[in-house]
């Protein structure tokens, strides 16, 4: 059964960064994005794009398909909530 209210993938990534002891600035540099772009993702203001999913995969954080599935599940749940309102 699908989760009715999955967390934003940025929350998962934020937990991963904390567990690895990495800062937002350091991680943004490794990902090749701005600190602001990563911060928006971590705070649920932006989603994980295919390019970001691949960048995360290259750094060893699971695979790109995993990140895209998290984003798709989140987006679908959000749309279901909007349509139910």
Task: Describe each model-derived feature in a short phrase.
Residues 50-69:
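DNA major-groove recognition helix of helix-turn-helix/homeodomain DNA-binding modules
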Residues 22-40:
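Short alpha-helical DNA-recognition segment
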Residues 66-83:
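Short amphipathic recognition helices of helix-turn-helix/homeodomain-type DNA-binding modules
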Residues 36, 46, 65:
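Key DNA-contact positions within bacterial/archaeal DNA-binding proteins
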Residues 1-22, 65-69:
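A short, Lys/Arg-rich alpha-helix, primarily the initiator
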Residues 1-2, 82-85:
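Short intrinsically disordered terminal tails
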């Amino acid at each position: 059964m699908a989760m009715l209210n999955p967390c934003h993938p940025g929350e998962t990534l934020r937990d991963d960064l904390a567990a690895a002891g990495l800062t937002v600035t350091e991680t943004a540099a490794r990902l090749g994005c701005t600190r602001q772009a990563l911060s928006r993702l971590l705070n649920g203001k932006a989603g994980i794009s295919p390019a970001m999913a691949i960048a995360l995969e290259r750094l060893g954080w699971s695979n790109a398909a995993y990140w895209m599935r998290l984003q798709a599940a989140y987006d679908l749940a959000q749309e279901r909530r909007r349509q139910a309102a």
